[in-house]
């Protein structure tokens, strides 16, 4: 904001500025009046600047100057005033008049400078009159093309099938028994697991049908083959029995199970000894099984493979299916009533149950025929609106709802050529009937039956053609008008004969079909649009040709220039047009005159302004007349009667010049003149918006199910197996002996080093005693141990009886007991003599004894007794020490003394009992 002092100064200067402006305007008005006065007297002066400004000479053809109403424009800013050649002043009134004219000329020169073109590209052209050396004619009208229309379009309903990559799923039942053998070692204060053996054995067929399915029970023993040996395992090392199956603790969405025991049998051993225990757990488990084409095997949710077709059976067709096992491992049970092991109820309807034994388990499943259980193709899309178009030897099925186009041959593809495809006709017919009843029942009629086409990418298109009711009635009326039988509705070629059977191989992506749809959509739209444009363009050109022929008679130059494409001059020579080439003139070499009046003819004026130009910068100045569109005519014969109120705009360079009353007024820019368009708008329909939505051939779940193994389910089942069939919370406590020993150890440990030493000795003895007693009691508590002890006792009693009998015989008759053979011989001789009645030889009938031999026998017996006594004494001396040796020495001395003192005797004397004791 300006300060107050500045405002006061501006208020004082403003009246002075207004006064100066008014004086300048008055002076200009006086000068203009003088100039008009000179022009009224018929003076036509020619003004020329210095030689270096000769190109800016102004030729005023005696026309009147602009009046005050128009007012010549002032000097254009940025253009310097050109110096004028000073004239010799005249004295008096004449001198003042010349001064006024000089000012008027200066203003006119400034105005003319403003008229000059500012754009260097706005060229002027000089077109000489054609001589007829070159003539042209217009072309005759052309025939216009027709817009191509589609042919043989058919509407209908379609059902699209794809390859079935999902496996065949069914429920299978696993029967097996888990055998666990544990070995433990019992310490003084702890129990250590030293061995663990796990195995699985299949359940026999008879036990499945007669025990598990009939009673809901399972036996606790199992006999199976391992390493070519038949072995038997008993649960808890007890005789086998039937145990109830109980539901598992947890389950998965695809499986459930039952078991007989959840506790591991690990018996306590005696301190310092090993003990083994066996656990047999009968498990029945329902799992999901999967089999993929060609259905030669299936895999269980546990990860186990079974190499037999799920459709294998004993029937004629089922027996041809694949089976990798021997015949004795497979059994098919007709009339099998499955039992629900949870509720115990039996199914009301019988099934055919397949049973197969593997080395680890027995698998059972319900047999079903292969057809219609599986189908090699599956329904993908139901299309309510499907357009079929014929393109040469192919059909294109287009669906706007799918934004896809499927290309097929014109010949049909019978579904019988696809293996396991009986479901196609059944599912397609049901889908078509449902769509027709819901949407087309009142408006359309079916044409023939279902048609089958194999599309690119491995898709089977089942198509039902339709026609509207009105079109069907038209066909009937046409047939009646011709008095003919009703013509059959349009049909397609019959399907080819069925060849070798195979399966479809469908691509995972349908992008090619969507691209085909996009291309066909764009092609159809663009071709129709271009066809309409071409036809309309041709018709427009033929219609405009008439206008061109008429317009060339009025302005041949403009018509010829527009037709040839460059500036030419032209004139009509009868029915042809002569042309000549125009010469370009630079804008700075063209000068416009300020008046359009003829000095010699006051009532006649020029119809267009006069100009002066040069072909080159230093060339000679040539007079001409401004034509249309910056054309310079060499003749100045375009005249017209002068009229009052004359106003004209003429193209000059890149703008317009405005003449009023046949005198230059001012310059007008092209932008200041409103434009009226002569173009005809072409109304074209642009492409409609199409959103590409994701279209999946196979969903993520289908791709996941395409594999036989569901690894997530396998891992889930394996990790939950222990939770389902084992008790991991129950703990078996140690024996009381271990608790007693642990308490004693803690007691002695609290007494210090001495107590620990004493405790070790006491604990060792106590543990030994407890172990012996526990071993004996455990051995006796065992049935086998008790039987063995009984047998040992019986054997001991028998041995004692025979020993006692022998001792009694030895005491009664030692010689007979010690020498039974000798006594047997004497008794035999005596019996023989008694039987014969002959007396024995010798006096008195008794055989005489040899006294010498008897004495030798007595001596031998005596010394044998002495030797035995001496051996006993020596043996006792080794144990008793010195006293025993002294006693033995004294005994020897006594014996020797007795032997030397006793005289030899021939009679037999037995050794007395006291003597034998003394020797000992």
Curated annotation (Swiss-Prot):
Domain of life, per lineage: Viruses
Gene3D superfamilies associated with the record: 1.20.5.1890, 2.30.29.100, 2.30.30.1230, 6.10.250.3280
Entries under InterPro entries matching the protein: Glycoprot_B_PH1, Glycoprot_B_PH2, Glycoprot_B_PH2_sf, Glycoprotein_B_ecto_C, Herpes_Glycoprot_B
UniProt cross-references to Pfam families, sorted A to Z: Glycoprot_B_PH1 (PF17416), Glycoprot_B_PH2 (PF17417), Glycoprotein_B (PF00606)
Keyword 4Fe-4S: no
Disulphide bridges: 127-582, 144-538, 218-282, 375-423, 605-642
Position of the signal peptide: 1-39
Annotated spans, Disordered: 46-106, 876-920
Residues with glycosylation annotation: 98, 119, 152, 409, 441, 683, 733
Compositionally biased spans, kind Low complexity: 61-71
One of the GO BP terms on file: virion attachment to host cell
Spans within the Virion surface topological domain: 40-783
Subunit-level organization: Homotrimer; disulfide-linked. Binds to heparan sulfate proteoglycans. Interacts with gH/gL heterodimer.
Protein name per UniProt: Envelope glycoprotein B
Organism: Saimiriine herpesvirus 1 (strain MV-5-4-PSL)
